[in-house]
Amino acid sequence: MKYTDNALNILTAKSYKGIGNAWIVKNLKGNESIETIVSLLNKTIKDEPTSEDEFERLKRNFESKLIEKFEECCDGFVALGDPYFPQHRGNVKESERPIFLYYKGKIDLLSIENVNITVIGLLNPVGDIEERERKIVEQFVKNGATIVSGLAFGCDSISHQQALDSSGYTVAILPSPLNNIMPARNKGLAFQIVEEGGLLVTEYGTDFKSSMELSSRYKERDRLQALFCDTIILAASYAQNSADLHPNLLGQKLDSGARLAMGYARDYNIPRAVMYDEYLDESNPMFDLNRKLIKEEKEITIITQDNICEKTKKILNKKPTVKTTATFQQGNLFE
């Protein structure tokens, strides 16, 4: 398993009470000495001051636990300041920037130099939604893009499977640790993604303790789907109020992950696109969110069955969104 001393330092610092992503981003660039980190922590934490010895003890404890827990299922972990830690796209506030990732597969697929297209949607697509989504994914892969999505059933799985069928690369972002792939029924797809040169990535090294925590993790996963892509594409999704708009859906709890991811993309100034054909989808509730986004944003790209090639080229030729740049000390990854 590959990791740097810097990654262990970031993980250890984050374990202190009151220390979150925003604090890490504001105070650490990566590769600081333990003396410096402890000094900064003691200016912030409200508990008893920590010490270099205590920090070192916590750090080695984390290291032994991670090796024991993930040696068989994780290729490594990277943190802010590491040479292979992926930079986010777009304008992301400090509290929402990732600082630490566990991975299995090729972490460089999230590189700022890579062209990444996120394709997402609902859990239960019907009719010709799958066929149309596959054609879009196929075209992007054909033009050299890497596909990014969650690992949920439905549109997420379709995007990964088509990327693999098209001999392309794909990245699955998880809400769970790598030793507990979720959903469990998609473990086979997860293994296939890695075997065929793709990537599994997660911010989590522990299992969730409650349904509320799991819900929060799905939201955090949705933000990563947005900030690690150059454009995000919505295949199909219900809107937040779909159950109220359609009598046959009254009382149903409809999935909202795609809605959240598209919202994060808007906030981060990541280009957005939707799959939508007015003549086919006008009365289909599974395209409620697509219609809503089209009404809200005049600049959104609309992909139909007839313009896939044209819109693919347009999306890939867009100027990149604002991307952060930083100079990292080239710490050595070690086994």
Q: Positions of the model-derived regions?
A:
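Glycine-biased, small-residue-rich flexible motifs in mid-sequence functional cores and linkers
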Residues: 1-7, 80-335
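Short, small/acidic-rich helices and loops at N termini and domain boundaries
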Residues: 1-82
